[in-house]
Regions:
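Transmembrane alpha-helical segments of polytopic membrane transport and secretion proteins
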Residues: 1-49, 273-295
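Short cytoplasmic-facing helical segments at TM-TM junctions of multi-pass membrane proteins
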Residues: 172-214, 241
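A membrane-interface signal for the N-terminal entry of alpha-helical transmembrane segments
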Residues: 101, 251-280
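Transmembrane alpha-helices
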Residues: 159, 163, 195-229, 259, ...
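Transmembrane-helix boundary motif in ABC transporter permease subunits
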Residues: 102-131
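Periplasmic/extracellular loop-to-transmembrane helix junction in inner-membrane transport proteins
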Residues: 30-39, 62-107, 247
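Glycine-rich helix-loop "coupling/hinge" segments at transmembrane-helix boundaries
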Residues: 148-149, 177, 225-258, 263, ...
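Generic hydrophobic transmembrane alpha-helix motif, especially the helices
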Residues: 132-168, 175-176
């Protein structure tokens, strides 16, 4: 005959078995992909694209479309690149310093102008279309004016870099503010946010995805403007990527010229991936946005 103590012990034993079963299931859950697998999954498409580009490049050289001293293949170009890598890195430092300095100033100007235009109907009516017009204007068209105003100097390049980047930054912020949900602004007003607090805690965070897109585009315009400027405005004593590109072209050293082009391309890719790509991923995670590039 079962006693109450025996029944209680049986129930306790059954509960222990069920809990241990749950623990077993929990420990047996399949783990996610390893870090190496994640790195490989992210890297192989890029590596494949590089290999395909190199193969196509070499096939074009082999086709005899141009003599190999005019269009060298990957091997002599990479030999020139690694053979003089220190010089290219020094030149890249000069170019990047110019680029970041101009972009930082454009960031300040573009943010201020974008915030004012987005929140002021009169300003939007007066200069809204002008900002878009400045954004579409080729950077090379500014250099004659820049040289007239600032002579052949760093300021001439700085002037064009700022004009290349600021309109895109301003338009990115304007677009982000225009697409803010009205309920967020009403909630900020109810909670007592006014002017600067409204902009700092409500408007800017809500507009951040579009604003970062504007920053990314602004950097692209700044980088293109900068390299165009270094090809046109040659400053003695300032060894830059643009100057090195022009010198190699003048000397007919086309392998070295293309090596500089590769350095310029790699810098553009790295800045986009490490700076803007990282910012975009963090914003997507923070705002719960879907990564359209995934799956």
């Amino acid at each position: 005959m079962a006693t109450p103590e025996n029944g209680s012990a049986a129930r306790t034993d059954l509960l222990d078995r069920e809990l241990s079963g749950l623990d077993h299931l929990e420990t047996e859950l399949p783990s996610g992909p390893s870090r190496a697998a994640r790195i490989w999954a992210a890297a192989w498409p890029k590596l494949s694209a590089i290999v395909i580009a190199l193969v196509v490049w070499q096939l074009v050289v082999w086709s005899g479309w141009k003599p190999d001293y005019i269009l060298p293949g990957p091997v002599p170009v990479f030999e020139a690149l690694f053979g003089d890598l220190g010089t290219y890195m020094s030149a890249a430092g000069t170019t990047l310093l110019r680029g970041f300095r101009g972009f930082a100033f454009a960031l300040v100007i573009g943010t201020i102008v974008g915030a004012l235009v987005a929140r002021n109907r009169v300003l939007r009516s007066a200069i809204g279309s002008m900002i878009t017009g400045l954004q579409t204007m080729p950077s090379v068209a500014w250099f004659p004016l820049a040289i007239v105003l600032f002579k052949v100097s760093e300021n001439a390049i700085f002037f064009v870099v700022v004009l290349g980047a600021a309109p895109s930054i301003a338009n990115g912020l304007i677009s982000g503010i225009d697409n803010i949900q009205p309920i967020l602004l009403r909630a900020g007003t109810v909670l007592g946010a006014r002017r600067w607090k409204m902009f700092r805690h409500v408007i800017l965070p809500a507009a951040l995805p579009s604003f970062v897109g504007g920053l990314k585009q602004g950097w692209a315009f700044a980088w293109r403007s900068l390299l165009a400027g270094e090809l046109i405005v040659l400053i003695p004593g300032k060894f830059s990527l643009g100057q090195q590109l022009d010198v190699n072209r003048s000397l007919g050293d086309y392998s070295a010229m293309m090596a500089v082009m590769i350095v310029i391309l790699v810098i553009g890719i790295l800045v986009d991936a490490l700076l803007f790509g990282t910012a975009e991923r963090k914003i997507r995670r923070r705002y719960g946005l879907v990564d359209t590039a995934a799956g």
